[in-house]
């Protein structure tokens, strides 16, 4: 791997360039009209204009990025986060032209990008799930019966959802019909998919995510947790590592569950498995983010590791740099 294109901008592009320089790999930046003078453009070894200022006319233009990969003999693409980082179609197109995506396969993205598919995949690996259903529901009466069985309060959630969109809390049966219709409408307009499912609402939950890495040989490790319970409108505000509520035993159990999630979708690269935890410290699988996250430096601080370097090493076919026993938490 001699030449890597970063299909992103700003802070994450600069972060990837820093590690590429350290590893003596050539970096290729892309930029829009608005970013012509941006730091990542000057810090990369090469930089190419891909379009006008709106991201839809530049950073999301798969055709231009793929053409650039072919013309500039790019070996691999680092997608960063956002933009095309969890786009299975883009992953497939890169594969077709012989360019390695520094990330998971399209099939892993496809499974984990749909909450229902993800639940069905991890169920076979005995990963704890919030009580509810793991199939799409459209019939109101059937949905009401399920809600009654698992007891209110319940959540109606969009299968393709994220960031709190297409999610509705229902406290009583008389609210159900209206809230379900609102969830479906929001899911349809936000994701083009109105499939919804029902889960028991976990009251006063903690939100704990586990950083994972998997190589091409089927080996998986976890790099411990980040707690992101402090949120506003379902968006994380503070990330803390390690979590103050996890005992070594619970941490190990959550880590094993996260590893099972990776195995359920034949994962490769960096990912984050998110769990909800109730007041009794029971934890439940929520979803998996199939990319490096904005908050990855929090994990780097407590492990002393360069997670972008791990991503690149795995993408070029190396084994995991460390075993689970060699990984330790250092600091807070």
Where are these regions (language model features)?
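N-terminal beta-alpha lobe that positions the nucleotide/phosphoryl donor
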Residues: 1-273, 277-296, 302, 319
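Peripheral (often C-terminal) accessory segments that flank ATP-dependent C-N-forming ligase machineries
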Residues: 141-143, 278, 312-332
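Active-site-proximal structural scaffolding
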Residues: 301-304, 329
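Polar, glycine-rich mid-to-C-terminal structural blocks
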Residues: 305-312
């Amino acid at each position: 791997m001699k030449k890597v294109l970063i299909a992103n901008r700003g802070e994450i592009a600069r972060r990837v360039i820093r590690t590429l320089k350290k590893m003596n790999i050539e970096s290729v930046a892309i930029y829009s009209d608005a970013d012509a003078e941006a730091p990542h453009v000057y810090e990369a070894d090469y930089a190419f204009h891909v379009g006008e200022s709106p991201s839809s006319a530049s950073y999301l233009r798969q055709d231009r990025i793929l053409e650039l990969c072919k013309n500039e003999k790019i070996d691999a693409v680092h997608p960063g986060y956002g933009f095309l980082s969890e786009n299975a179609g883009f992953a497939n197109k890169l594969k077709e032209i012989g360019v390695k995506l520094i990330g998971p396969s399209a099939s892993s993205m496809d499974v984990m990008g749909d909450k229902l598919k993800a639940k069905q995949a991890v169920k076979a690996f005995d990963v704890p799930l919030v009580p509810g259903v793991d199939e799409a529901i459209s019939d109101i009466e059937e949905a009401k019966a399920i809600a009654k069985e698992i007891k209110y309060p319940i959540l109606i959630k969009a299968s393709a959802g994220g960031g709190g969109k297409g999610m509705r809390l229902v406290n009583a049966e008389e609210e159900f019909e209206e809230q379900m219709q609102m969830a479906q409408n929001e899911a349809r307009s936000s994701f083009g998919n109105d499939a919804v499912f029902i889960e028991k609402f976990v009251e006063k939950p903690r939100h704990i995510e586990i950083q994972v890495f998997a190589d091409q040989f089927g080996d998986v490790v976890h790099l411990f947790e980040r707690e992101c319970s402090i949120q506003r409108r379902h968006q994380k505000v503070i990330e803390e590592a390690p979590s103050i509520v996890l005992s070594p035993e619970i941490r190990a159990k959550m880590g094993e569950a996260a590893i099972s999630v990776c195995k359920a979708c034949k994962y490769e690269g960096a990912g984050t498995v998110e769990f909800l935890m109730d007041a009794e410290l029971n934890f439940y699988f929520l979803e998996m983010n199939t990319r490096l996250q904005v908050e990855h430096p929090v994990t780097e601080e407590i492990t002393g590791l360069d997670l972008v370097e791990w991503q690149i090493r795995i993408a070029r076919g190396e084994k995991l740099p460390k075993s689970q026993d060699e990984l330790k938490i250092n600091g807070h």
